[in-house]
């Protein structure tokens, strides 16, 4: 099983995986990787650690998808899967989207995260709203004969 857990920052993605993953499952969570690299804080990492964690995560995701094909159970936290979606779909991933109101997200950020997380939440919500907005369709005018 390959499960991609998505949602805004502070929506409960890591908590969901902690509650559902079994011992021995592969779990890819950026903050966990950053802490493994030496970050003293679970949610506030130096630039150097962030850069290494980004590279590690990219490699880990590709490897985990291959291990999933070999029968491993894989959980991936992915706030913004974008370009990775086709690979996830080809691998037969299931998707879980964590939701919370903006007020809940900001309350959690105030309780557990550095101040800059409020901006990250707002950026995510704007990106999500743009993705959900209907796109205007183009209309073609035809004359009575059906030609343009």
What are these regions (language model features)?
Residues 19:
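Active-site signature of alpha/beta-hydrolase-fold catalytic machinery across serine-
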Residues 2:
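Walker A (P-loop) ATP-phosphate-binding motif of ABC ATPase nucleotide-binding domains
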Residues 22-90:
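Conserved nucleotide-sensing/catalytic segment adjacent to the nucleotide-binding pocket
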């Amino acid at each position: 099983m390959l499960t991609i857990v998505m949602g805004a920052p502070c929506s409960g993605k890591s908590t969901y995986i902690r509650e559902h993953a079994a011992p021995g499952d592969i779990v890819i969570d950026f903050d966990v990787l950053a802490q493994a690299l030496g970050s003293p804080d679970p949610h506030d990492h130096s630039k150097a650690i962030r850069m290494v964690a980004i590279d590690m995560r990219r490699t880990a995701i590709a490897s985990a998808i291959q291990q999933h094909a070999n029968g491993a159970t894989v959980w991936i936290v992915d706030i913004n899967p974008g370009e990775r979606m086709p690979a996830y779909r080809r691998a037969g991933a299931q998707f879980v989207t964590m939701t919370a109101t903006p007020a809940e997200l900001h309350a959690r950020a105030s309780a557990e995260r550095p101040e800059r997380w409020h901006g990250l939440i707002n950026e995510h919500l704007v990106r999500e709203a743009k993705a959900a907005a209907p796109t205007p369709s183009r209309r073609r005018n035809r004359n009575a004969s059906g030609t343009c």
